[in-house]
Structure formats: C-alpha cells, structure tokens
Amino acid sequence: MMEKMLVQWREELSEELTCDILPFWMAFLGDGVHFAGRIDGRGKAHPEAGKGAVLIARMLWTFSAAYRMTGRPEYLHAAGKLRKFLALWLIDPVHGGVYWEIAPDGSPVCGKKQSYAIGFAVYGLSEYVRATGDPEALDEAAALFGSLEEHVWDAMRGGYVEALTRNWQPLEDMRLSEKDANTYFSMNTHLHLLEPYANLLRVWREDRVATA
C-alpha cells in the first residue's frame, strides 16, 4: 500500500514540476536577457524591478539539475541562458564576486558582496558543470570560490564574514535583509556556503575545496 502511494506521489510531483513549475519559469525567462526582475503574487511581471543574484543563481541550479535528471533539452537551454546572464551581468569583472542586484539596464544597484549570494552563484554554476561539463562555468565557479577564500574567510575568528563592500572592505550594514540581525557571522550564511562547496567538490576535486 505504502509503495503504491509513494509511486503515485512521485508521479504527481513530477507532473507538477514538469507541467507547471518549470514551464512557468521558462516563460518568465524569455530570451534570457530582457526579462522582469520580479513577478508578484498575482503573476504580474515588473520589468522595472532589479535582478537579484540569488534568484538567478537558484534558477540556474534548478534548470541544471532538471536537465541532469531528465535529459530534456529545453531545461539545458534555460540553464544556458541563466549561466550566460550570471557570467555577463552579475559577476563583478573588476573585483570578483557577484553583485547583490543589478538594474534592468545591467548597472549595479547594490554592488555589495553578500557571501550568501556568492555561495548560491557557486552552487548554480557547479550544478551546471555537473550537468554539462562546461569548463568555462567551472572556471567561473572556481574564481568565486577563490574570492570567498581570499576576502571573506576570517582565519582568526574561524568563519565567513556576512558581507563586504564591492571591493571587499568592511561594511557597516551586513544584513541579508531588513528582518535579519546585523551580525558578523550567521549560521544561515555558513549553511549556504557548505552546500555549494560540497557541490563544487563534486566537479573540482581540489584539496582546498575539501578542507574549506
């Protein structure tokens, strides 16, 4: 009885994912450049909204994982758009890391380096590498990892700083959001660095990743 229920739930969840959730986000993505930064609870697109690194990186992970699990080319196409967008618009070409948010025209709205967001970028890129073996995406993930280790890791205190300025200087307000505490370290950020580091190790068997 339980086995039949599990099979049924799996079929229902798979249908929900492939027929509703993923198609919704593929339609939202459009050409992969000129898409709205926000869709509200009523499904209305807001093209004037900025595009956040966390949203893009999470979508990149999602479509990369979906392609890896199903082999469906439309998911690979979506993942490719997202990886390209992340590389061209959200990775800081001057200082490394990723911008927290960019405007619709691509200019940084908030250039601070939030460790949480950089971690998600590593997570999305490493999953894309798992799905495709793309060496450029691996280089991008490795560079972000290097930025975290060079600038964010505080060896004296034994943790990763919550946030820094665009050029990796101390930041007075390090909060992830207005409802979060303004703390130097947080469990939330450390959990969301452990996850991408573990995923990166799957595709980049470097000792410095394993020991980080």
Q: In which residue ranges do the predicted regions lie?
A:
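Glycan-recognition and catalytic cores of secretory/periplasmic carbohydrate-active enzymes
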Residues: M1-A212
